Amino acid sequence: MEEEEVDGIPVNEFGRLEIDFDYGFDFTGIVTPPVSTDYDVTLYAKLGLYCYNFQKGTNLKFVRWEKYNTSTGTAYIDNYITLEAMDPSCNSVFSFQTVFSAAGCYNQDTYHVQDWRVLACRPTCGKSVNEYFDRHEAMDPFYTGKIPKWLSDDALAFDNKKYYVVQESDLHENDWLLVFMEMVFLQENPELKVSPPLEINKVVVETKEDYITEAREKLHAENAIFYISYKYTGVSSSDHKAIIRKTMDGVPEHMSLEIALVK
């Protein structure tokens, strides 16, 4: 088969431009602040940082995004984001880059599921991006089948080693849970331009594996399912539910978040 090209650049089998890391981030259509619709970019950047912190054991904090550009195909939108991150341990600020992808959606029973992926997350460098996410070969089938139904109280009481009910103290220590919640609300309300007033009601984490020492270990599992109920506290306040399946395929800098909105 003859290789396709876009503006003289080869396109690989996944429909993405075969470009090196720096060129991918500065290829075309670069957007810089201030813009009025940057809330989504901020969330994407924070999720890239979360993936890096999770895999590296660091605690980098988001400062601001500097620029981004997008690459689109028939089934995906890749956002190449350059941001400033801070290391609180030494108060140093440095350039960081992440690729955050809207990797497609599907319908399952009453759910509409969107698959979001981090395909790169690291301090700025010139390495290429591995955009192939191998969900089925690298993962236990427990995390690749259908999104489970909303967790009932009976199920939670029946097998409490399988689940962990997140405590208030966990929310303070794991502020990425709030980012997960905001990402859910953004998926439901893609027109959002600023951070909405939201409050978590309850989060339950499920893993196939039992915990070793304490149940809160499930918060730090590579693969896990989160049942999140929360409240929008703005005008016309409302309650919301979502299921998030977080998976990693064993490739550094990769993470998938499948988000199912529960009606």
Question: For each predicted feature, which ranges?
Answer:
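N- and C-terminal low-complexity/disordered segments
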Residues: 1-263
